[in-house]
């Protein structure tokens, strides 16, 4: 039997998603909880491997098991063995050809910026604090140069293991809600650090250091060294993963928190 789970987590206390020796990861913690529920060893496969400090409201995983449990037990039972910063949101049985990563058709991220001279005391680990004023409208306009299928070498980490820098961005929206600036981006997939590298360069436009057209120029150069530094991990959330409807993966609120879909 193959089961898919929707996972939400605060990545602040974890060294990323992927299981690693000698450090605590989200994958390891979830697998240990599921193994307690089944009394067997469980290995999970995820839709997107988030980095250290990155959060998830819409992560999807799957695992294979011969243990039968009511769907509610996969949620409540697993959550009983998890700390408060990881939670199972839903569980469904899926077809044998489903794969959390390879069946996905799109991933969606949101980057949350607290834009104020002074820091916030409310949920400070869930946002990236930038004290200089940002023009969200200019950031949005600049982001439109990145839409479509393009070579994202300028926004790709040096140690990225992907065979190709080509990705297809479906939408990139930047909006302001009070002191918060939200960058919402969806693509078929992302190269390593792509979202945080894009946001870093959009921040240069937002604070007036670079013109809107600079993003177009960066894309054309295909040179990571010309773009801005990678932004902080704590503002980034994996909020949704899209799959073909035949798999029956539930649709839930994207979040985080108050943000509308």
Curated annotation (Swiss-Prot):
InterPro entries: PsdUridine_synth_cat_dom_sf (IPR020103), PsdUridine_synth_TruA (IPR001406), PsdUridine_synth_TruA_a/b_dom (IPR020097), PsdUridine_synth_TruA_C (IPR020095), TruA/RsuA/RluB/E/F_N (IPR020094). This is tRNA pseudouridine synthase A. Formation of pseudouridine at positions 38, 39 and 40 in the anticodon stem and loop of transfer RNAs. Its EC number is 5.4.99.12. Homodimer. It catalyses: uridine(38/39/40) in tRNA = pseudouridine(38/39/40) in tRNA. Keywords: Isomerase, tRNA processing. GO terms for biological process: tRNA pseudouridine synthesis. Transmembrane segments: none annotated. Pfam families: PseudoU_synth_1 (PF01416). NCBIfam families: hisT_truA (TIGR00071). GO terms for molecular function: RNA binding; tRNA pseudouridine(38-40) synthase activity. Belongs to the tRNA pseudouridine synthase TruA family. The active site is at 51 (nucleophile). CDD domains: PseudoU_synth_EcTruA. It is an enzyme of class 5 (isomerase). Substrate binds at residue 109.
């Amino acid at each position: 039997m193959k089961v898919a789970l929707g996972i939400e987590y605060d990545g602040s206390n974890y060294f990323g998603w992927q299981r690693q020796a000698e450090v605590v990861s989200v994958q390891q913690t979830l697998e240990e909880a599921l193994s307690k529920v089944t009394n067997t060893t469980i290995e999970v496969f995820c839709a997107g491997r988030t980095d250290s400090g990155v959060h998830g409201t819409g992560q999807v995983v799957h695992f294979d098991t011969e243990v039968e449990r009511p769907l509610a037990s996969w949620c409540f039972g697993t959550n009983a063995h998890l700390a408060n910063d990881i939670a199972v949101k839903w569980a469904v049985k899926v077809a044998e050809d489903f794969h959390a990563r390879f069946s996905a058709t799109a991933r969606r991220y949101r980057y949350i910026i607290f834009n104020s001279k002074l820091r916030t005391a409310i949920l400070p680990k869930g946002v990236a604090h930038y004290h200089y004023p940002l023009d969200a409208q200019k950031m949005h306009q600049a982001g439109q140069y990145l839409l479509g299928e393009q070579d994202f070498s300028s926004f790709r980490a040096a140690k990225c293991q992907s065979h190709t820098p080509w990705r297809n961005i479906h939408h990139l929206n930047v909006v302001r809600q009070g002191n918060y600036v939200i960058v919402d981006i969806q693509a078929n997939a992302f190269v390593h650090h792509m979202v945080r590298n894009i946001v870093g360069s959009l921040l240069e436009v937002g604070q007036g250091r670079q013109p809107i057209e600079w993003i177009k120029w960066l894309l054309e150069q295909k040179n990571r060294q010309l773009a801005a530094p990678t932004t902080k991990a704590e503002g980034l959330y994996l909020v949704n993963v899209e799959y073909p409807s035949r798999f029956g993966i539930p649709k839930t609120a994207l979040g985080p928190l108050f943000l509308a879909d």
